[in-house]
């Protein structure tokens, strides 16, 4: 099986209600608030080290039994800039995509430097389901 690094669309960032724990020396997000500044329409989005997916895409990931992820609630808001520029856009429901898999083993994994690694099966699913504005998708060498 082949694996890929993917850098999803960044449509915003952490909102003020995001809770981050740095007590272990690493950044661990306890509660995620994603605030949109713009949106090109992808159903997988990033704000390092977190990812969110549309509910529709999360259902497809579950239907395919892809490994290395679980889903949780995320608070979604729109910035003033978003509301001014995108008056006619309704955002779908998003969920927090918590990646807990091993890179190069599971369908979704995170490297030590916080890069998202996906299997070819996951890549095919993402490409068929509204992920077309990723900053980059590159082959991961073993």
Positions of predicted regions on the chain:
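Acidic (Asp/Glu-rich) sequence patches and key acidic residues
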Residues: 1-142
